[in-house]
């Protein structure tokens, strides 16, 4: 390669990372399951004092392994060696539509491999803190919430999410608001690091194989729902709010034993640590475990709203349930659900002449909600009632069959309680099927019968 020719850098997609891991782990090329994690630490994924107390000081700066092309090496270096102030720069788009920071993911994988007996054993921390949670989430949470508490009043401790420039060829990710030390991709990478690290602690597997099984592959694969779309449930089972609170206290205790003590801990007493840990665990659990993930408009490829949206005045008193009828088949992957959203929006804008997709939110059978008009814009879903409630459509025709149990639970047990907790809906809200308020069979006989047993139905 002459110096003038820059290498072709693969897109920032999980598939690119899987190709890199395949090459690094190939026994034919001298690799093993621990190769990628060790390389990651050499490149700087574990740069915080707590992470280094668990995984050790980073090895020297690595050179490009012969198994990787120049473009792959450049991508890996950019993803893992970035400014700690911009953690979202280390993120890739996964096949399920989520954006995953590789740092906490790889740290969790290394902690899991080492607890499972591969490589050097992990140290025993004092006070006893869970090493897997420490390197993925608890140090980051404790740090972020202590800084937010000590900072100016509008300092945020979690979020925001963001948008990719191009979902087919993701290169640049931009946050949609003021940054915090734990933006959504870091929270998601941490949850995945905990879920996969816990799996590896039970026995080593090739990391590429594990990730391929977890995320699925390709944007538009029509296979069923990948395990990664259950990360909130699976993380919650491993680290519920009470456990998370206890582990944030423990990891801050470990940081206090280091020399020098990190700046943000210097004048912090035990009661303050306890209060911060409680706050951090509650906020994290509500945002990332108990509430469903919502795919923003930018990720499914929405066209702009035509004109100026009218604003809702929450909290609202009602939720109206619909089925989309077309597409008649539920969508089980991000690719299929994003396509369904674009089709519905096109039909609503071009055929019906509306300003935008009519629903507030649309529910896929892939484990995600898709933002239509969202929490703030008046929808076009339930004629005569659009300012009084949110319209939620489930992709599919539910005249004779029901959505699968996970999709029903997503709406009944996650979306509705979250809408109340976040102040968008009154606690004594009413739930209606579309047919109760207009001449229509929507949301289909099967679904309408099902929701009559749900809280709030009238």
What role is predicted for each listed range?
Residues 1-328, 364-458:
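Basic/polar, cationic surfaces and motifs that engage anionic cell-wall
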Residues 313-349:
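Active-site acidic/histidine clusters and adjacent loop/turn architecture
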Residues 346, 350, 417-420:
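A generic structural signal for well-ordered alpha-helical segments enriched in polar/charged residues
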Residues 354-355:
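RNase H-like, Mg2+-dependent phosphodiesterase core
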Residues 358:
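Glycine/small-residue-rich phosphate/adenosyl-binding loop
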């Amino acid at each position: 390669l002459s110096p003038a020719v820059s290498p072709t850098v693969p897109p920032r997609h999980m598939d690119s990372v899987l190709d890199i891991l395949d090459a690094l782990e190939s026994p034919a090329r001298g690799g093993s399951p621990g190769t990628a994690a060790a390389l990651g630490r050499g490149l700087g994924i574990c740069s915080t004092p707590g992470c280094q107390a668990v995984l050790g000081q980073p090895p020297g700066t690595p050179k490009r392994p012969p198994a990787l092309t120049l473009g792959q090496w450049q991508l890996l270096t950019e993803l893992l060696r970035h400014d700690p102030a911009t953690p979202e720069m280390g993120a890739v788009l996964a096949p399920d539509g989520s954006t995953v920071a590789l740092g906490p993911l790889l740290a969790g994988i290394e902690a899991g491999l080492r607890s499972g007996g591969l490589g050097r054993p992990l140290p025993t921390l004092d006070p006893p803190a869970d090493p897997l949670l420490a390197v993925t989430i608890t140090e980051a949470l404790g740090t972020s919430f202590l800084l937010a508490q000590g900072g100016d009043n509008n300092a945020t401790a979690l979020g925001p999410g963001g948008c990719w420039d191009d979902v087919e060829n993701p290169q640049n990710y931009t946050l949609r608001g003021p940054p915090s030390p734990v933006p959504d991709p870091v929270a998601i990478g941490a949850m995945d690091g905990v879920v996969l690290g816990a799996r590896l602690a039970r026995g080593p597997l090739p990391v590429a194989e594990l990730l391929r099984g977890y995320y699925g592959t390709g944007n538009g694969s029509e296979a069923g729902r990948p395990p990664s779309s259950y990360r909130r449930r699976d993380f919650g089972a491993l680290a519920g709010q009470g456990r998370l609170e206890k582990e944030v206290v423990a990891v801050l205790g470990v940081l206090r034993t280091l020399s020098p003590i990190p700046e943000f801990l210097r004048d912090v007493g035990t009661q303050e640590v306890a209060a911060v840990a409680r706050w951090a665990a509650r906020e994290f659990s509500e945002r990332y475990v108990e509430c469903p993930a919502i795919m923003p408009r930018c990720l499914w490829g929405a066209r702009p709203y035509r004109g100026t949206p009218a604003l809702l005045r929450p909290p609202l008193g009602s939720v109206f349930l619909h089925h989309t009828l077309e597409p008649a088949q539920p969508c089980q992957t991000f690719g299929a659900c994003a396509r369904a959203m674009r089709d519905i929006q096109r039909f609503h804008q071009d055929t019906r002449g509306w300003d935008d997709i009519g629903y507030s939110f649309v529910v896929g059978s892939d484990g995600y909600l898709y933002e239509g008009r969202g929490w703030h814009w008046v929808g076009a879903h339930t004629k005569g009632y659009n300012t009084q409630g949110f319209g939620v459509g489930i992709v599919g025709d539910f005249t004779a069959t029901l959505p699968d149990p996970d999709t029903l639970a997503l709406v009944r047990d996650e979306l509705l309680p979250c809408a109340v907790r976040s102040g968008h809906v009154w606690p004594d809200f009413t739930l209606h099927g579309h047919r109760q308020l207009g001449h229509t069979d929507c949301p289909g006989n099967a679904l309408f019968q099902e929701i009559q047993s749900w809280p709030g139905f009238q």
